[in-house]
């Protein structure tokens, strides 16, 4: 469960980072991506552990709120599932069609570039 939460928060952070304040960005980056403890972050910013904890929890809610309204992460995951399903179908049924395979790869590359 904890790994899934970390993955989700990191993913939401990638999509919605520009909408956060510098302090929110720093705390989330250090806590989730860099695996700092609350105490380490508190020492870095000369604040209490409770202040860091409150800021991180508030930012998690903000990220989830953005996702609830904008669905960027959900839509990204759904598109990837669909592209994977199409790719698998093409490989099974049209494995000799190099043009079709190339077009799907271009679609995958477009999605990767937009991250």
Curated annotation (Swiss-Prot):
It holds the Pfam family UPF0122. Belongs to the UPF0122 family. It comes from Lactiplantibacillus plantarum (strain ATCC BAA-793 / NCIMB 8826 / WCFS1). InterPro entries: RNA_pol_sigma_r3/r4-like, UPF0122, UPF0122_fam_protein, WH-like_DNA-bd_sf. Coiled coil: none annotated. Might take part in the signal recognition particle (SRP) pathway. This is inferred from the conservation of its genetic proximity to ftsY/ffh. May be a regulatory protein. NCBIfam families: PRK00118.1-4 (NF001068), PRK00118.1-6 (NF001070), YlxM (NF045758). Transmembrane segments: none annotated. HAMAP family: UPF0122. Signal peptide: none annotated. This is UPF0122 protein lp_1634. It comes from the Bacteria.
